């Protein structure tokens, strides 16, 4: 009876999420995990189903893998109360040892690409900054196709999540700076199909230390906290603080049996002389997951070392035919693209040549137009210059006439000045004579004054004597005589003083008149020079003109090319490593040391020591199984 019932009231609602789609199914209540898994694989067209599984969160909030042999409803799958739907995630449960040799279908590669990319971006898988940029360029190639300078726009990559947050946080770089470095790698990629680009992405990602490793916390007999890493080639033991470099490893061909009892996990090795490898987990649920992953990885490990089954051979043949067909189509596409690019280049050159000729013609027309404008400008300037010359000549004649007039006036002023100077000299001489005469008269006046004083004194004496004489009896006649003599002497003295004062007044008046006349003449003279200064400006003209100016052999070639792919990859890997080293050096100055995580520090130590994932595993496998078990127990 089919597991997919038709009764809606009894069916189970299931939603399965992949990285690029969501699927919804109705299952019969008795449907097993295998029924649901097969339905999902058929829906998405997946045949390499052994790598994948259905993951869910159980009723205890633990992440678990759906068991294929048990019914879905019996596996403690949490039922969403809002819509009664069982929710699962379709993830890769096991990883191949070599993606380029083992992954056959394009859909398988695509699912691995999406999951690994998401694990790197979410930092579940540690990736160095320079490798993150390279992987981001491949992710851009998958999303947008080969680089096309015509369609690419600056800022086109800013919207998507391309780099892990841990990478962007530890460097002081803007999104534009990161985009420029991703774009540089993107431009260097050869034109490839989407599946080829995804394969290149996975080839680089599988070299990362944490790729394909499922980590579980464990302890040894000394109760030392460690990490158990379940991988496609065996079991790795890691230090609690270092998930990158394993302390020791055991390959699946060295392990005979795996079992657990409660929290104790026992691994029996192929070498009977070596004691069992024992560790302890935190709870029973982790032990069940470890056992499930160990069984699945061990089966795939042994399967890879056996001849391919008919189904796988058929799948590989179909994939090879499909790849050859795509190679033929790609060759044809590349040839057509080159022809189209050549035609476009020729058309571009013709358009460029035509545009160049048009520019030259436009420039010639512009030059001709400017020449005509210049010619007109020169004519106009010539006319203006002639007018200015005429105006200048008129002004020169006017200035000449004015200068003659001023020269005559200057001569007249000189004559007046000469006459005035003569008058001033005469006046000075006259004043000098008057001064001398005045001094003489002042001396005479002083002399007369003294004589007057002496006369007054003599008069007093005479009066005294007269009074004495009058006492003798001739009083009346003597008084008359004395009075007449005094009046006559006073009149003579007043007349002499008036004669002396008059010349002094005349001299003062004459001097004032001369000074007034001289001042008027000097003022006129000064005004004359001011006028002459105001009208002595000239006219200059410094204006200057400015200048303006697939056949039968294709299948064989494709087959040989496919055989050389691996060798080409090894050759290209050296070039990629060199480019990664260059990028690491470029971004090193922008590093913020305090933002580095523990994994960043451990990775830097790996680089300095010259170690990588494969060299470390090779060293660990060089020791004997017994020595590795003893080393684990002593940790």
Curated annotation (Swiss-Prot):
SUPFAM superfamilies, sorted: Moesin tail domain, PH domain-like, Second domain of FERM, Ubiquitin-like
FERM domain boundaries: 12-305
Complex and partners? Interacts with Moe and arm at the adherens junction. Forms a complex with Kibra and Ex. Interacts (via FERM domain) with Sav (via FBM motif). Interacts with Schip1.
Q: What species does this protein belong to?
A: Drosophila melanogaster (Fruit fly)
Q: What does this protein do?
A: Regulator of the Hippo/SWH (Sav/Wts/Hpo) signaling pathway, a signaling pathway that plays a pivotal role in organ size control and tumor suppression by restricting proliferation and promoting apoptosis. The core of this pathway is composed of a kinase cascade wherein Hippo (Hpo), in complex with its regulatory protein Salvador (Sav), phosphorylates and activates Warts (Wts) in complex with its regulatory protein Mats, which in turn phosphorylates and inactivates the Yorkie (Yki) oncoprotein. Mer acts synergistically along with Ex and Kibra to regulate the Hippo signaling pathway.
Q: Name one GO cellular component term.
A: cytoplasmic side of apical plasma membrane
UniProt-listed SMART domains: B41, FERM_C
Gene Ontology biological process: axis specification; cell-cell signaling; compound eye morphogenesis; compound eye photoreceptor cell differentiation; endocytic recycling; endocytosis; epithelial structure maintenance; hippo signaling
Sample GO molecular function, one term: actin binding
- Kindly provide the name given to this protein in its UniProt entry: Moesin/ezrin/radixin homolog 2
Signal peptide range in chain numbering: none
Q: Where in the cell is it found?
A: Cell junction, Adherens junction; Cell membrane; Cytoplasm, Cytoskeleton; Apical cell membrane
> What is this protein's tissue specificity according to the annotation?
Expressed predominantly in the germline. Expressed in the developing oocyte from stage 6 to the end of oogenesis and in the apical ends of follical cells from stage 10. Ubiquitous expression throughout embryogenesis with enhanced expression in mesoderm of early embryos and midgut of late embryos. In embryonic CNS, expression is seen in neuropil and developing brain and is enhanced in neuronal cell bodies. In embryonic PNS, expression is seen within the cell body. In third instar larvae, expression is uniform in the eye imaginal disk and is enhanced at the morphogenetic furrow.
Q: Is-annotated flag, keyword Transcription regulation?
A: yes
How is the protein disposed in the membrane? Answer: Peripheral membrane protein
Matching entries from Pfam families are given as: ERM_C, ERM_helical, FERM_C, FERM_M, FERM_N
